[in-house]
Amino acid sequence: MAERNEQLERLAYEYQLLQAQAQLLAQNLELLTLGRNEFQAVKQTLEELKKVEDEKPEILVPIGAGSFLKGMIVDKNSAIVSVGSGYATEKSLDDAIGYLDARIKEYDEAIRKTQEALAKLEGQLQELAQKAQKLQQEAAMRFSVKE
């Protein structure tokens, strides 16, 4: 009986650890998805800019709190893109779009790996729950047999 209780406690502890890991992975997955969506939105904006016929199109520049300033794109043939660690570089629109595509693919791969790891953890959680349920059923059967 004491051994069964120890097994149940050990299973509960393992379950809590795996559940915490799964929660961290789910949060990471959410952050990765947000990052990917941001890169996708920038890419789409640059693709749409290529279609604009005006040489210096007018735009709205967000300044926060839902407020904007009217502005003008001085050079619609290039964009300044972040390359990480606080650095940015000027690229042609096509090069910028290519760079963004590569980053989106990196995000897609990280998302895929995170989803796989999360699915594996969920499978392990399910196995632990089944083991615990089996132990509890065995204990209940022994208890009812003794009565």
Swiss-Prot record:
It is found in: Cytoplasm. The keyword Cytoplasm applies. CDD domains: Prefoldin_alpha_GimC (cd23160). One of its GO terms (biological process) is protein folding. GO terms for cellular component: cytoplasm; prefoldin complex. Keywords: Chaperone, Cytoplasm. Its main location: cytoplasm. One of its GO terms (molecular function) is unfolded protein binding. Belongs to the prefoldin alpha subunit family. Heterohexamer of two alpha and four beta subunits. HAMAP family: PfdA (MF_00308). Molecular chaperone capable of stabilizing a range of proteins. Seems to fulfill an ATP-independent, HSP70-like function in archaeal de novo protein folding. This is Prefoldin subunit alpha. The lineage of its organism: Archaea, Methanobacteriati, Methanobacteriota, Thermococci, Thermococcales.
